[in-house]
Swiss-Prot record:
Lineage of source species: Bacteria, Bacillati, Bacillota, Bacilli, Lactobacillales
MF term (GO), any: tRNA binding
Protein name (Swiss-Prot/TrEMBL): Alanine--tRNA ligase
Entry text on domains: Consists of three domains; the N-terminal catalytic domain, the editing domain and the C-terminal C-Ala domain. The editing domain removes incorrectly charged amino acids, while the C-Ala domain, along with tRNA(Ala), serves as a bridge to cooperatively bring together the editing and aminoacylation centers thus stimulating deacylation of misacylated tRNAs.
Gene Ontology biological process terms in this record: alanyl-tRNA aminoacylation
Enzyme class, first EC level, given as a word: ligase
Entry superkingdom: Bacteria
Key words, A-Z: Aminoacyl-tRNA synthetase, ATP-binding, Cytoplasm, Ligase, Metal-binding, Nucleotide-binding, Protein biosynthesis, RNA-binding, tRNA-binding, Zinc
Gene3D superfamilies membership: 2.40.30.130, 3.10.310.40, 3.30.54.20, 6.10.250.550, Bira Bifunctional Protein, Domain 2 (3.30.930.10), Threonyl-trna Synthetase, Chain A, domain 2 (3.30.980.10)
A GO CC term assigned to this protein in UniProt: cytosol
Binding residues annotated for Zn(2+), in chain numbering: H567, H571, C669, H673
Substrates-to-products reaction catalysed: tRNA(Ala) + L-alanine + ATP = L-alanyl-tRNA(Ala) + AMP + diphosphate
Database matches in Pfam families: DHHA1 (PF02272), tRNA-synt_2c (PF01411), tRNA_SAD (PF07973)
Length: 872
């Protein structure tokens, strides 16, 4: 077996499959493009779903890739085991309706065992297979695999909901008896026992059925096009080929671990407690790649995942004695390890470091809050005479504050308290069940549509015309091909068409189809791409249509021009965002409609009003500069040399269109555009908002809609000016400001009067001092307008030695507000209010010196006040 670096393994994999006629698919962005069913790209096949479900036919049915992936359903196990990771690389080879079982197994065996390639010893390889899949068993035997090395497994059948499914055969490497201390042997495989001896290095899925949850597996229909989908983990291959005990001792992780050693002053012990090193090394890889691909830490979705990873890594850094921000210092090391295939981490190093450091600094403040929360929980246990920290509270510390369970356990036990492990496990399981349910909900690839996949007739979209005559090639009605149709709805394919099929954020054209007499025979309501790329016209049929007949196709020209204004403006907006807020503000989604444009982009905070003003100004300057718009067809590499902005994650064919707007914007784009930027007329941003963690959205209008937006604003301003009696529009702001200042002065005067009234009332309240258990206290109901007045009472009380404890209750509307203040260490205000609040059907909490609560039962106020003497 060859000893190769991870980069050599990856390259040898790709080279082998290229030698078998496969095209190399570049690794896609970790953030899925146009796939709402996935939070992350989580496998090599995830980006190829459109090929497997038949919605798109690839140019080459043989594909290979090395795909960066993220899976986060098992974060808590990362660092504990030898092979769990959040971010990993999946090497794959795929056949879309081309070769099948025989070639997949034979070539796979060749790659693994040939001296020209990986050169694995054959006697170290074991294969599992689905018991009913005798063909795979026989093919392995034909390759020279001993029958004793083939293990039938009932679970070797791959399916996720409806869609492509089939048996799979897995390949394992035997690391020997040293990794099997109990000498269990092949039963480890047969019974699926977790072990370190037999390492799964490759899975070959034989996708031959359309799974249907409504019928038994034996009744699944065969796919019209059988597929091969395989996955081999680079980290596992590297561990085996580099003789590493775990994935973490490979060249993918050890350089990071060495840097952590320098930062911590601790030494990584492969046989000792090294969990924190592993967690940090794993999580910083995931963070670096995900942030580089446009995901940002936040409170929801993938942003929450990143925040959780970062916080877990920081806490493990603290366990190693690293108490300052440090994760951002590891980003260059991650970039250097992966540079040969993923140069983007080093290219975006400054931005990634900035985001990681900023998030670390924020978490440092959160840790203080979490520590305070734990202190409060422990104080509450002490007050209640309990000795166990509940699982739900441990989970909240873990989930909300990022506290590892081990840290909570350590601090709680140091304080003399036990841990409710079962309660924590229950809360954790509930969260995992919710997460897994969400994944399964949209995880299937969808059923193949044989009718659409069978369309092979050529069809060409003509960019530069709004009307043309063309022959009708295909009619599909009720999901069946037919020669003619006279009513209802149908799908049509023409030899050529002026109708743009929806793609790249640009909506489809609408229009009409006419016969040779000039009569409209169909209305085009939508156009989408067929699996083989032909524009597929959805039409409402008004009169007879037949295959082979020529028709005149006319698009709605006015609508197309309105869409083009918005599409061209989108390119200008994208460039302006780069110039004003930074290169990281890349497209995360777009929609170019007739009435407006919508542009989503990656950014870590709201765009300020001043920045929006600059962006709007810059776009309009380019419109007024009357820039010529040109399109060029070329290959991707030439386009990039021209400076074209490729949208990371998008797939481009051999020939791409480059849209250039003067010297201001150059992008790869297959959409339609104006001839000159001046045709846009006017550009106006109408809204900027956040739509998810690290993603912002701008909605803008152009041309007539932009003019109307400005006019509507002017009308609103005129109305305001009239209301405040401003002589001219320019005076309206000053008038509004004067009214605001006057209102503020009146509110201040009113507050001062309230304070004086409260002080006068306080004089009476503070005279009623009682004593119990050696503690002086005041317990009184007061008549105030809001809860803030209670705090004013407390502030006045603190100024003099009226009593040790103050308890105030006020009925405000339908609510009861309670305040407890304490000057003595013998009475904890927060604990006391937790006993008082339930009396008025409320709850609350606070600090030792001040606490507040809210309730709903005003009839029990007297009972609450009477209880103070007992509780104090």
């Amino acid at each position: 077996m060859k000893e190769l670096s991870s980069a050599q393994i990856r390259q040898m994999w790709l080279d082998f499959w290229k030698s078998k006629g496969h095209c190399v698919e570049p690794s896609a962005n970790l953030v899925p493009v146009n796939d709402p069913t996935l939070l992350w790209i989580n496998s090599g096949v995830a980006t190829l779903k459109k090929y497997f479900d038949g919605s798109v036919i690839p140019e080459n049915p043989r594909i290979t890739n090395a795909q960066k992936s993220i899976r986060t359903n098992d974060i808590e196990n990362v660092g504990k085991t030898a092979r769990h990771h959040t971010m990993f690389e999946m090497l794959g080879n795929f056949s879309i309706g081309d070769y099948f079982r025989d070639e997949a197994i034979e070539w796979g065996f060749e790659l693994l065992t040939s001296p020209d390639w990986f050169d694995f010893p054959k006697d170290k390889l074991y294969m599992t297979y689905y018991p009913d899949d005798k063909d795979s068993y026989n093919r392995w035997i034909a390759c020279g695999v001993e029958p004793s090395h083939l293990v039938p497994i009932e679970d070797n059948f791959w399916e996720i909901g409806a869609g492509p499914s089939g048996p799979d055969t897995e390949i394992f490497f035997d690391r020997g008896e040293d990794f099997d201390p109990e000498n269990i042997g092949l039963r480890l495989l047969a019974e699926d026992i977790e072990n370190d001896r037999y390492i799964e290095i490759w899975n070959i899925v034989l996708s031959q059925f359309n799974a249907d949850p409504a019928v038994p597996r034996s009744e699944y229909k065969e796919l019209p096009n059988k597929n091969i989908d395989t996955g081999a983990g680079l980290e596992r291959l590297a561990a085996v080929m580099q003789g590493a005990k775990t994935n973490f001792e490979t060249d993918l992780f050890m350089p990071i671990i060495r840097e952590v050693e320098k930062l911590s002053g601790k030494t990584y012990d492969p046989d000792g407690d090294n969990m924190s090193f592993k967690v940090i090394a794993d999580h910083i890889r995931a963070l670096s790649f995900a942030i580089g691909d446009g995901a940002l830490p936040g409170n929801e979705g993938r942003g929450y995942v990143l925040r959780r990873l970062l916080r877990r890594a920081v806490m493990h850094g603290r366990r190693l004695g690293i108490n300052e921000t440090f994760l951002y210092k590891l980003v260059p090391t991650v970039g250097q390890i992966m540079e040969s295939y993923y140069p983007e981490v080093l290219e975006k190093r400054d931005f990634i470091e900035k985001i990681v450091k900023r998030e670390e600094e924020t978490f440092a403040r959160t840790i203080d809050a979490g520590s305070g929360h734990l202190d409060s929980l422990l104080a509450q246990l002490k007050a209640e005479g309990k000795d166990t920290l509940e699982g739900k509270d441990i989970f909240k510390l873990y989930d909300t504050y990022g506290f590892p369970v081990e840290l909570t356990e350590e601090l709680a036990e140091d304080a003399g308290y036990k841990i409710d492990h079962e309660g924590f496990k229950s809360a954790m399981k509930e969260q995992q069940d919710r997460a897994r349910a969400a994944v399964v909900k949209g995880g299937s690839m969808g059923m193949q549509n044989e009718t659409l996949a069978g369309i092979v007739e050529e069809s060409r979209f003509e960019y530069d015309t709004y009307s043309l005559e063309s022959s009708l090639s295909v009619i599909i009605a009720d999901n069946e091909r037919t020669e003619a149709v006279s009513e209802g709805q149908a799908l049509l394919v023409f030899a050529q068409t002026p109708f743009y099929a929806e793609m790249g954020g640009q909506v489809a054209d609408t229009g009409r189809i006419k016969n040779d007499k000039g009569d409209t025979v169909a209305e085009v309501v939508d156009v989408q791409k067929a699996p083989n790329g032909q524009p597929l016209h959805t039409v409402n049929v008004l009169a007879s249509l037949s295959v082979g007949t020529n028709y005149t196709l006319e698009i709605n020209k006015e609508r197309r021009l309105a869409v083009e204004k918005n599409h061209t403006a989108t390119h200008l907006l994208h460039a302006a965002l780069h110039n004003v807020i930074g290169e990281h503000a890349t497209q995360a989604g777009s929609l170019n409609e007739e009435e407006f444009l919508r542009f989503d982009f990656t950014h870590f905070e709201a765009v300020s009003n001043e920045e929006l003003r600059h962006i709007e100004q810059e776009v309009n300057e380019q419109i007024w500069n009357a820039l010529t718009i040109t399109t060029t067809e070329t290959d991707v590499e030439t386009a990039k040399e021209m400076g074209a902005m490729a949208l990371f994650g998008e797939k481009y064919g051999k020939v791409v269109r480059v849209v250039q707007i003067g010297n201001y914007s150059v992008e790869l784009c297959g959409g339609t555009h104006l001839n000159n930027s001046s045709e846009i007329g006017l550009f106006k941003i109408v809204k900027e908002e956040g739509i998810g963690s690290g993603t912002r959205r701008i909605i803008a209008v152009t041309g007539r809609q932009a003019f109307e937006a400005y006019r509507n604003q002017e009308d609103a301003l005129k109305e305001i000016a009239a209301t405040v009696k401003a002589p001219q529009l320019k005076d309206a702001a000053a008038k509004v400001q004067a009214l605001s200042d006057s209102l503020r002065d009146l509110q201040k005067e009113n507050a001062e009067l309230k304070e004086k009234a409260a002080a006068a009332a306080a004089g009476d309240v503070f005279k009623d001092v009682q004593e119990a258990k050696g503690v002086r206290f005041i317990a009184s109901q007061v008549d105030v307008a809001d809860a803030g007045a209670l705090r004013t009472f407390a502030d006045n009380w603190k100024q003099k030695d009226y009593s040790d404890v103050l308890v105030l209750v006020a009925a405000i509307g339908e609510k009861v507000n309670v305040l407890v203040a304490s000057k003595t260490k013998d009475v904890h205000a927060g604990n006391m209010i937790k006993e008082l609040a339930p009396i008025v059907a409320g709850r609350g909490g606070g600090k030792p010196d001040m606490a507040m609560a809210g309730g709903s039962d005003a009839s029990k106020i007297a009972e609450l006040l009477a209880a103070v003497a007992e509780i104090v």
